Amino acid sequence: DNNGDDKPDDKKVLFNVIGGKQHDHGIHAFCFGPDGKLYFNFGNASRGLKTPDGKIIIDKAGNEIKDHRKPYQQGMVFRCDPDGSNVETLGWNFRNNWEASVDSFGSIWQSDNDDDGNRGVRINFVMEFGNYGYRDEFTGKGWRDKRSNIEKEIPDRHWHLNDPGVVPNLIQTGAGSPTGIIVYEGKMFPQLLNQVIHCDAGPNVCRAYPRKNIGAGYNAEMMPILSGGKDKWYRPSDVAVGPDGSLFIADWYDPGVGGHGMRDLERGRIFRVIPKDHNGYSFAKRNVNTLDGAINALMSSDLESRYLGWKSLHKMGIDKTEKSLMKLISDNDLSLIHI
């Protein structure tokens, strides 16, 4: 959008994939990280990442980004520059990972879906360059194949969790159809600060996953935020944080879920979630073309404002911005977690 009319003025292809176009195991979303890079993923239908002219991309580690166990396979997570260059493969061996979310400290979180019906939906802390166990690391065999030290329970067996080198899951949530995910960095819900919030269209629920440190990673518990109850057409597909810190949940509203199916093409809903004692919807307007406005945007609850602030500050350059940013950091204000 070059002229501010909220309409794209041109279109540029960043990547192609081998397969999985218009597929629920394909590419779904990009996320802007605090390092100025783009984060994204694809499920196991995509099978590889290609340049716009169809060449397999070689990542920064010198490997082909391709499902061929050298070393990558199945679904993958990536990081790249805004123009699509300098691609890094951050994790692999997922099945149907939907979206990667990056918090202000650079940690990456996502969900993954099991072979439907095996109660193995999982949330992952993406430890960079990790193998996440959907298929055997060396043979590519599935979880049903016999192997030594096989897990007792199918949800654990599904991800080869006893195999050496497989990164443990943050939490497994049972059956479901996981969709959008964020890390909450607003002030309206202090009990959710820095916690993962995630939609699951299968059991008709949006949940938070408060976590605790364990070893080099984390574990978590489930905390429902907005459930469908008796309304089985409630299919939360994404969650976002508003500039005031409230939550917005998108519901595609359909009787079914999965398998590319949809029966209601006309209706959808958006819910806003606020504390019981909160009224209204207001937030400060910012002019990101000024230094103060860009810094204030960088401290916003919502990622979109932070992106605009980050972009403006980088355009201004270090000579104009460094003094003000260093003063803010020295103030030690909780709202500065986004810098």
How should these model regions be labeled?
Residues 1-296, 304-315:
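Beta-propeller domains with acidic blade repeats across secreted/periplasmic ectodomains
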Residues 283, 319-324:
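Flexible loop/turn segments at the boundaries of HEAT repeats in alpha-solenoid HEAT proteins
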Residues 296-297, 324-332:
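Alpha-solenoid HEAT/Armadillo-like helical repeat scaffolds in large eukaryotic proteins
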Residues 301-302, 332-335:
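Short inter-helical turns and helix N-cap capping residues of alpha-solenoid HEAT/ARM repeat scaffolds
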Residues 337-339:
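Conserved small/polar residues in nucleotide/adenosyl-binding loops
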